[in-house]
């Protein structure tokens, strides 16, 4: 018996274990898990049936003058405000689909932060709600703000980027509500679009005009073609 105990003690010393009665076992150290990656995608395709079902009666009314065949459904990778990679959705006119895929690919590669890219239908087609959520969007069959004329958004030819930090500004009103602090463009703050901003430069390089240079109103979120 003494011989067995001596052997056990020797083994304990060799492996460095703690042989005290009641002592807890050492924790098992597992390999560190690899982070889960989000797929990188930049695609444009005709409007799928599932997306059409989401749009009808919301962003796409029954009396819309533009055909669904003239629109494209885009899936776009982007980096959100937390630095996390996401995949968003846009619907746009087929005439600018390639431009937008190229622009958003460049923004992604530069890790340009965008808070959200979701279809306006996720907000019931409500532009104010989408802007208040700082959501980047494109197609929405609606009229220009305060006017009878159709917006370029109704044709899928306009994109609003990070709208809360880049609001629509009139002398008497700022949209979205609550974004007045971002109306003064002489101030520096994160996510501001100006002529030195990468987003501005990319859209201009692809032939888009910017609402930030309009005279009667300024729409700093807005790019159209």
Predicted ranges, named:
Residues 2-10:
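Sec-dependent signal peptide recognition
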Residues 13-14:
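Hydrophobic core
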Residues 17-19:
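N-terminal Sec signal peptide cleavage junction
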Residues 25-84:
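N-terminal module-boundary/linker segments of secreted carbohydrate-active enzymes
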Residues 36, 143-150, 155-225:
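Catalytic cores and adjacent binding grooves of peptidoglycan-active enzymes
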Residues 66-131:
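Active-site acidic/histidine clusters and adjacent loop/turn architecture
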Residues 79, 99-113, 142, 164-167, ...:
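Structured segments of extracytoplasmic/periplasmic soluble domains
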Residues 118-155, 166-168:
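Active-site-adjacent loop/helix surface patches within enzyme catalytic domains
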């Amino acid at each position: 018996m003494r011989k067995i105990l001596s052997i056990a003690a020797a083994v304990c010393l060799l492996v460095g274990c703690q042989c005290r009665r009641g002592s807890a076992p050492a924790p098992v150290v597992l390999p560190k898990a690899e982070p889960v990656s989000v797929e990188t995608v930049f695609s444009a395709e005709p409007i799928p049936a599932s997306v059409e079902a989401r749009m009808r009666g919301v962003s796409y009314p029954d009396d819309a003058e533009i055909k669904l065949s003239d629109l494209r459904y885009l899936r776009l990778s982007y980096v959100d405000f937390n630095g996390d990679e996401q995949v968003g959705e846009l619907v746009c006119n087929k005439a600018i689909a390639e431009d937008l895929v190229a622009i958003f690919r460049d923004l992604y590669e530069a890790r340009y932060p965008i808070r959200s890219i979701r279809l306006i239908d996720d907000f019931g087609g409500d532009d104010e709600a989408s802007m208040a959520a700082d959501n980047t969007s494109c197609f929405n069959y609606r009229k220009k703000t305060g006017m009878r004329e159709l917006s370029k958004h109704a044709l899928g030819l306009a994109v609003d980027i990070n709208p809360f930090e880049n609001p629509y500004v009139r002398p008497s009103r700022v949209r979205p509500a609550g974004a007045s602090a971002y109306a003064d463009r002489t101030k520096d703050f994160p996510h501001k679009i100006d002529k030195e901003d990468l987003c501005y430069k990319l859209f201009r390089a692809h032939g888009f005009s910017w609402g930030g240079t309009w005279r009667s109103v300024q729409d700093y979120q807005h790019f159209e073609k």
